[in-house]
């Protein structure tokens, strides 16, 4: 499974999950947006379409691309988001990384990539990419029911419906 991460050099390198992923041989870091593979699914928190099983073939053929930047600076990374026609956002999930533990939707790069792989039914790869992170298994355990429901949804609209039903049940 091809995983590429555009690294914006805005993070604390000691806590950076994409740098650790690269050291573990689980992704390729790029620092130039022109090095991002065309046709890959690009994770984009501003995308109108949620990742779903209908993205399976794009992830399988071209991979997934994460953006590693500060959540405080993500809106300034808009240039990154013009690179692919397969921009996808992630549905509601809860972070378990040490920096944002328990915060909804503020995922680390490795959590976002893992969630994308899980939702597109690359579940073994989703688990594997979290190996090497002490808290990695916690992400899948805490979000298990949602990830399963999202992975069973065939389309982006179905994923959004599952998300909305979950959020409404919590009100």
Swiss-Prot record:
It is found in: Cytoplasm. GO terms for biological process: enzyme-directed rRNA pseudouridine synthesis. It catalyses: an N(1)-methylpseudouridine in rRNA + S-adenosyl-L-methionine = N(1)-methyl-N(3)-[(3S)-3-amino-3-carboxypropyl]pseudouridine in rRNA + S-methyl-5'-thioadenosine + H(+). Its main location: cytoplasm. One of its GO terms (molecular function) is 18S rRNA aminocarboxypropyltransferase activity. Keywords: Cytoplasm, Ribosome biogenesis, rRNA processing, S-adenosyl-L-methionine, Transferase. This is 16S rRNA aminocarboxypropyltransferase.
